[in-house]
């Protein structure tokens, strides 16, 4: 505020709690990038009745539900499924186990999250979805960080395609 900032704009903020550290006099706006991803899936997945939006964990269910609602608002009402992954971690960035909650058999699953960091959660979720009969597994994330082992994990994964925005610049 003392620097003259009167508004902060973010895209799919990872930790909404940080907005509480901003002065009440400073406006805070967070925009969702989900609509940018929906268009890619609408144009590239032929049978929309076989799409299932998947939350990679309980923390992302609101985002997945919003993505699901926006998909339906794009003309696919009552055609798109919704599922969730339940994951357990003992330490940060290391997922011990994931369980599928919902019907994904024969579906084109789209895992929706705000960011992909080391891709551990994403790759384990994709594998679990395929083990439960998913026809294909895609991912959409606003922020593609791709830290540390992410590239090798993704290369070795069962993921069919990852779609991210350009919110994080990469040299390669």
Task: Label each region the model flagged.
Residues 1-172:
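PRPP-associated nucleotide enzymes
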């Amino acid at each position: 505020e003392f620097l003259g900032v009167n508004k902060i704009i973010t895209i799919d903020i990872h930790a909404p709690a940080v907005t509480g550290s901003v002065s009440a006099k400073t406006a805070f706006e967070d925009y969702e990038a989900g609509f940018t991803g929906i268009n890619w899936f609408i144009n590239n997945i032929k049978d929309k009745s076989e799409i299932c939006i998947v939350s990679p964990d309980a923390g992302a269910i609101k985002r997945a539900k919003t993505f699901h609602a926006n998909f339906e608002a794009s003309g696919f009402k009552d055609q798109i499924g919704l599922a969730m992954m339940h994951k357990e971690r003992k330490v940060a960035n290391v997922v011990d186990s994931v369980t599928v909650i919902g019907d994904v058999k024969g579906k084109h699953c789209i895992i929706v999250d705000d960011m992909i960091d080391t891709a551990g959660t994403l790759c384990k979720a994709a594998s679990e979805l395929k083990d439960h009969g998913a026809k294909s597994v895609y991912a959409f994330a606003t922020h593609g960080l791709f830290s540390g082992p992410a590239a090798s994990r993704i290369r070795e994964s069962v993921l069919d395609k990852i779609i991210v925005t350009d919110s994080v610049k990469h040299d390669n």
